[in-house]
């Protein structure tokens, strides 16, 4: 009798397949500020968060509030950050996108006003303000997609810090192993044809081949539902 394949085991929700969120430092959210006002804060430390690839900044605001924010390029310990409608449009400040000039780079963008920031949060990425209309602002996302947002949505001016991360090779499998331990993923990932017959429908045999058709019905049972699921066609397009 075969064993449960990885896709079945993942559904059980054991710690192997769950993100270690107890190690994550905080949910990074823009501070709430009254309209037509702004507050200033000072960066007292730059830290690493296992939850993300970009560094985070510990900021103490003039109200006494201490908050962790996503760090942008150019931010250092001792830098001053402004947040609010009256804040200057300069790197690191949190301002409404409706007040950002066209062509400026922004990151950590809100989807709705005061939701804290949803888009463009990975290291080294940025979006570009394209144009403004009376009640909406067009922003070019890193994917190239144009997204229309409420001009009251806030964003950080500049580029997320930590750029160039994807250009650096891992060099050692141990480095990749420790990185994957912070994610909800199983590493290393073994192909089905390299497994034993009890572990996967494509396992076993004298050499690495599935040994059976790789197309499978949409209604196949969970242990067999691997390969090209409900494929309309297979092979090279002619």
Swiss-Prot record:
<keyword id="KW-0694">RNA-binding</keyword>
<comment type="function">
    <text>One of the primary rRNA binding proteins. Required for association of the 30S and 50S subunits to form the 70S ribosome, for tRNA binding and peptide bond formation. It has been suggested to have peptidyltransferase activity; this is somewhat controversial. Makes several contacts with the 16S rRNA in the 70S ribosome.</text>
</comment>
<feature type="region of interest" description="Disordered">
    <location>
        <begin position="203"/>
        <end position="223"/>
    </location>
</feature>
<dbReference type="InterPro" id="IPR023672">
    <property type="entry name" value="Ribosomal_uL2_arc_euk"/>
</dbReference>
<dbReference type="InterPro" id="IPR014722">
    <property type="entry name" value="Rib_uL2_dom2"/>
</dbReference>
<dbReference type="InterPro" id="IPR002171">
    <property type="entry name" value="Ribosomal_uL2"/>
</dbReference>
<protein>
    <recommendedName>
        <fullName>Large ribosomal subunit protein uL2</fullName>
    </recommendedName>
</protein>
<dbReference type="GO" id="GO:0019843">
    <property type="term" value="F:rRNA binding"/>
</dbReference>
<dbReference type="InterPro" id="IPR012340">
    <property type="entry name" value="NA-bd_OB-fold"/>
</dbReference>
<dbReference type="InterPro" id="IPR008991">
    <property type="entry name" value="Translation_prot_SH3-like_sf"/>
</dbReference>
<keyword id="KW-0699">rRNA-binding</keyword>
<dbReference type="GO" id="GO:0002181">
    <property type="term" value="P:cytoplasmic translation"/>
</dbReference>
<keyword id="KW-0687">Ribonucleoprotein</keyword>
<dbReference type="Pfam" id="PF00181">
    <property type="entry name" value="Ribosomal_L2"/>
</dbReference>
<comment type="subunit">
    <text>Part of the 50S ribosomal subunit. Forms a bridge to the 30S subunit in the 70S ribosome.</text>
</comment>
<dbReference type="Pfam" id="PF03947">
    <property type="entry name" value="Ribosomal_L2_C"/>
</dbReference>
<dbReference type="InterPro" id="IPR022669">
    <property type="entry name" value="Ribosomal_uL2_C"/>
</dbReference>
<keyword id="KW-0689">Ribosomal protein</keyword>
<comment type="similarity">
    <text>Belongs to the universal ribosomal protein uL2 family.</text>
</comment>
<dbReference type="GO" id="GO:0003735">
    <property type="term" value="F:structural constituent of ribosome"/>
</dbReference>
<dbReference type="InterPro" id="IPR022666">
    <property type="entry name" value="Ribosomal_uL2_RNA-bd_dom"/>
</dbReference>
<dbReference type="GO" id="GO:0022625">
    <property type="term" value="C:cytosolic large ribosomal subunit"/>
</dbReference>
<dbReference type="InterPro" id="IPR014726">
    <property type="entry name" value="Ribosomal_uL2_dom3"/>
</dbReference>
